[in-house]
Amino acid sequence: MQKSTPPEDLSRLTLLGREAKPSRKLETFPNRHPDRDYIVTMETAEFTCVCPMTGQPDFADLHISYIPDASILESKSLKLYLWSYRNEGIFHEHVTNVILEDVVAALSPRWCKVTANFGVRGGISITVEAEYKKPGWSKP
């Protein structure tokens, strides 16, 4: 087994190593261990969007976990993707599900879960969990 990342894995990446702006484009690279079920978790404590009613900022700890199939999510593209929501007026429940849908569309993972823990607003915190399981796949 090759121990370093082969150059062909880098050929599809257009954002990594370059100055960039917010983007809704999620990039991937090949999973070199498709025969194994393993969990990848990406987390940020800096996710922001805005309330569509008040325009006030909403802050969340965001966790994206998935079991890859053929592809792995490239982290800079995820950072720029999440940044694109900074000024987006969108409800917590909706944005969590949209992020799940976009990650699933980019990766076609075996399993994926997005958890968003939003900060307290009006004395109430909101946690949204959205989950996807590839048809026919069952967790071992």
From Swiss-Prot:
Entry keywords, A to Z: Cytoplasm, NADP, Oxidoreductase, Queuosine biosynthesis
Cross-referenced SUPFAM superfamilies: Tetrahydrobiopterin biosynthesis enzymes-like
Pfam families documented for this protein: QueF
Residues given in the record as substrate binding sites: 73-75, 92-93
Main localisation: cytoplasm
Broad class of enzyme this protein falls into: oxidoreductase
Protein name in the entry: NADPH-dependent 7-cyano-7-deazaguanine reductase
Species this chain originates from: Syntrophus aciditrophicus (strain SB)
Phylogenetic placement of the source organism: Bacteria, Pseudomonadati, Thermodesulfobacteriota, Syntrophia, Syntrophales
